[in-house]
Each structure stands twice: as C-alpha cells, then as structure tokens.
C-alpha cells in the first residue's frame, strides 16, 4: 500500500452494495409475491439478506473508524453532511403524509359526510395514551441530551445510564403504540382517516424502532469503550436521529391526535 498524503478515506472493495441491491430486489419481488400469491418465502429471504448486509456493512464501518483510524476530521465532516441530508430527506418523506392528512381534513368530500373526522369514525382521545406517549418521547429527548453531554465531559457511567433510560423509554413508547393500535376503534381500511392515521403514525413507530436499535448499538459500543469525548460521531448521529423522531411525533400529536380529533 502506498503512502497516503491526504485525509480522505479510500474505501476498500466491498461486496455489501451488491448484496444490498440484490436484497432490495428480493424484498420488492417478495412483496409482490405476498400480495398476489400469499407466499412470504421470497420476502423473508429478502429481509434476511438485507439485515445481514446492514449488519456486516456497519460492522466494517465500525472497524474502519474505531480500530483502523480512517475516520479523520475531514471524513467525519462528510459523514455529518450525509446524516443531515438523510434527515432532510426523512422530513420530506413525512411531509407527504401530513400533506395527505391536511388535504383530506381541511376540505372533506361529501362522501365522508362533509365533516372531519368522517361520519362513523370515533377518534382516539388525545389526552389519554397519545399524551402519555408525548411525555415519554419528550423525556427521552432530555435523557439522550444528558447522555451526549456526559460523553463530551468524559462521564462514562452517567452516559451509559442516560442512554439506557433513553432506550427503555423508546421501547415503552413502542409498546404503548402497539396497545393503542390493538384497541383503536377504527382500522387502516376505514377510509382516508384510517389510512392517513395508521400510515403516518405507523411509519413514525417504525422510525422509533430503528432509532432504538441505533441507540442499542451505541450502548454496546460504549460498553466496549468505542467512544471518546472528541470522537463519537456514531452516537452523535443516533442522537440527531432521535431528536428528529421526537419532533415528528410532536407534529403528529398536534395535527392528527389533537386538531384532527
């Protein structure tokens, strides 16, 4: 290997982009097979290969950053820009759901009874489980900030405690959301109200699960002393993502649960 005279990371050839693309093909084909032929074999194969690809790709990134020192300040800056752009793309993703909700609710069609919520729909009480969920996520936003500041100040045990609390609150939120779905008096097939409600809150719930997984990985990495007060972009990205999930929920709560009811 020749001597490197720049701060950029020249990535070694990797099989994971190819396996990731093939797993995406398997998943989309599997969804089609599931919808039309009620067969989930291809979908399960696609999900399994996708999970394995993500695990091994991120494992390689951790090796490159933590053990090989390839993530110089310049590389970290690029990763930060990448994470910011990813979160912006997620904002636009959720914008579509809010657009659908407000388009349907501000000018309800005569077929819905000319009112919102549509005739026959009994919306959930925003002052019960949804308000508890809001409190849980706001508390998790405080604890993740506590964890971040503890890490920057070198208080490892405090960081682990705060991160564990955040993960526990994330799991609690997911369980509350699942119980709310189970007890909801309407379904995703109950017109535009049901579809916009379950798609918007369901995708948010998926993002909470992804964010919780992200934080669990950071917890185990911190147990192995992977983060320092000056080199912890993996945790920083997880914290940014969690704050994004928090903010999206506040908009969902105000729009769909409170105003929409």
From Swiss-Prot:
What Pfam families has UniProt attached to this entry?
COX3 (PF00510)
Q: What is its EC number?
A: 7.1.1.9
Compartments where found:
Mitochondrion inner membrane
Q: Which CDD domains match?
A: Cyt_c_Oxidase_III
- What is this entry's stated membrane topology? Multi-pass membrane protein
Residues assigned to the Mitochondrial intermembrane compartment are 35-40, 106-128, 184-190, 257-261
Q: Does the keyword Transport apply?
A: no
The UniProt entry's GO biological process terms, in alphabetical order, are:
mitochondrial electron transport, cytochrome c to oxygen; respiratory chain complex IV assembly
Q: What one GO molecular function would you report for this record?
A: cytochrome-c oxidase activity
What name goes with this protein?
Answer: Cytochrome c oxidase subunit 3
Q: What family does this chain come from, according to its entry?
A: Belongs to the cytochrome c oxidase subunit 3 family.
List UniProt keywords, sorted A-Z: Membrane, Mitochondrion, Mitochondrion inner membrane, Translocase, Transmembrane, Transmembrane helix
Q: Per its UniProt record, what Gene3D superfamilies does this chain match?
A: 1.10.287.70, Cytochrome c oxidase, subunit III, four-helix bundle
Q: Which residues lie on this side of the membrane: Mitochondrial matrix?
A: 1-15, 67-72, 153-155, 224-232
Function according to Swiss-Prot or TrEMBL? Component of the cytochrome c oxidase, the last enzyme in the mitochondrial electron transport chain which drives oxidative phosphorylation. The respiratory chain contains 3 multisubunit complexes succinate dehydrogenase (complex II, CII), ubiquinol-cytochrome c oxidoreductase (cytochrome b-c1 complex, complex III, CIII) and cytochrome c oxidase (complex IV, CIV), that cooperate to transfer electrons derived from NADH and succinate to molecular oxygen, creating an electrochemical gradient over the inner membrane that drives transmembrane transport and the ATP synthase.
Q: Which reaction does it catalyse?
A: 4 Fe(II)-[cytochrome c] + O2 + 8 H(+)(in) = 4 Fe(III)-[cytochrome c] + 2 H2O + 4 H(+)(out)
Q: Does the keyword Heme apply?
A: no
Task: State which residue ranges cross the membrane.
Answer: 16-34, 41-66, 73-105, 129-152, 156-183, 191-223, 233-256
Organism encoding this protein = Tragelaphus strepsiceros (Greater kudu)
SUPFAM superfamilies cross-referenced by the UniProt entry: Cytochrome c oxidase subunit III-like
Disulfide feature:
none
Quote a single Gene Ontology cellular component term. mitochondrial inner membrane
Query: Which PROSITE patterns does UniProt cross-reference here?
Result: COX3 (PS50253)
Quaternary structure, from the entry: Component of the cytochrome c oxidase (complex IV, CIV), a multisubunit enzyme composed of 14 subunits. The complex is composed of a catalytic core of 3 subunits MT-CO1, MT-CO2 and MT-CO3, encoded in the mitochondrial DNA, and 11 supernumerary subunits COX4I, COX5A, COX5B, COX6A, COX6B, COX6C, COX7A, COX7B, COX7C, COX8 and NDUFA4, which are encoded in the nuclear genome.
